[in-house]
Amino acid sequence: MRFSDNLAKILDKYENLGNKLSSGIMGDEFVKASKEYAELEDVVAKIKEYNKAKSELEEANNFKLEVGLDNATLEMIEDEIYTLENSLPKLERAVKIALLPKDDADSKSAIIEVRAGSGGEEAALFAAVLFNMYQRYAELKGWRFEILAISDTGIGGYKEASASIKGKDVFSKLKFESGVHRVQRVPETESQGRIHTSAATVAVLPEAEEVDIKIEDKDLRIDTYRASGAGGQHVNTTDSAVRITHIPTGITVALQDEKSQHKNKAKALKILRARIYEEERRKKEQARADSRRGQVGSGDRSERIRTYNFPQGRVSDHRIHLTLYKIDEVVKNGQLDEFVEALIADDEAKKLLEI
C-alpha cells in the first residue's frame, strides 16, 4: 500500500470512529471506540498538517504557472514554495514516527535498580552517584521518586539501590539507561593521583500493575528473617526482613529497609512484579526477532553503554557516539535530557528504516 493510501485509510477510520461515538453507543463498545479514537488523535493531527502542506505546495506551483505575474508576486510564490518543500520531509517523518508501533510499557512508571560492579568501594561510591543523578533527573521532570531499598557500605557507597519513579511516560525516557555505566576518576584515597576505572550496572523496569501481572499466592515462597546492618550484626529484634521467591521463574527479591515486615513485603512485591513483567516482555520481543528491538544497542545489561570521565569532564554514550563536556551538569544536577532525547531519536531512526 502506498504511503498516501495508508494515510487516507487512517483518516477514514478516525472519521468513522467519531461518527460511531456520536451515534449513542454505550458500554464496552463505547469504551473500545473511545480508546481507539484517542490513540489516533496524535497521528491524525500530523497527517492533516502534512496533507495541508502538500496541498498548499500544489496550489503554489499551479499559481506560479499563471501568466502575467509581476516580479514581486513571483518572488513571494517562490519563497513559499521553497519553505513548503523544506518542511514536507520533516512533516512526513513526523507522521511516520507517529505511525511506529508503540511499546505498551512506554507510558508506565518505572523501577530503577543500580548495583555496584567491578571496582570495589569506588564502584559502590559511583553507584551512589548514579542513583542520586537519577533522583535529580526525576525532580527536574516533576516525577515522584520513592526509594525502595538501599544497601550501603557505611562510607557513602551503595552496593545496590532501587527506587520507584512515578510519572507520565517515565519508562519511555529511562529505558535506554539499562546497561553498564563506567567511571574514570581519581579516588579520594589515591595518593599518587592515578585514575581508577570502575563500573555500576543500571536496570530500568516498567512498573507493573496487578492488571499487568497476576501473581498467585501459591507461586510465592516468603521467608522472613532479622534485618542485619553493616558487618552482619542484627539491627532488629523481630523478623522484619523479607525474601520473596517467585517459584515458576525463580526470581527472588529480598528487602529489609523498613522496620515493618508488612512494608518490606509490599515493596518487595512491587519489585518482583516489575521483574516478572520485564521478563515476559523480553520473551515476547525475542519471539518476534532474533535480536531485541525497542532498545538501543542489544539492550543487554552487560553491555557498556556510557563512560563518565571526571578528569576530562566528559560523559560519552558509546551507542550513539555522543560526548558532552559537562559532567557536573549531568551527574550532579541530573541534566540527562540531551542523552535521553538523542537516544530516543536514534531509536526512532532505526525503526523508520524497518518501515
Curated annotation (Swiss-Prot):
GO terms for cellular component: cytoplasm. Pfam families: PCRF, RF-1. Gene3D superfamilies: 3.30.160.20, 3.30.70.1660, 6.10.140.1950. It comes from Rickettsia rickettsii (strain Sheila Smith). This is Peptide chain release factor 1. Residues 282-305 are annotated as: Disordered. Residues 282-293 have a biased composition (Basic and acidic residues). Keywords: Cytoplasm, Methylation, Protein biosynthesis. Belongs to the prokaryotic/mitochondrial release factor family. GO terms for molecular function: translation release factor activity, codon specific. InterPro entries: PCRF, Pep_chain_release_fac_I, Pep_chain_release_fac_I_sf, Prokaryotic/Mito_RF, RF-1. The modification N5-methylglutamine is found at Q233. PROSITE patterns: RF_PROK_I. It is found in: Cytoplasm. It comes from the Bacteria.
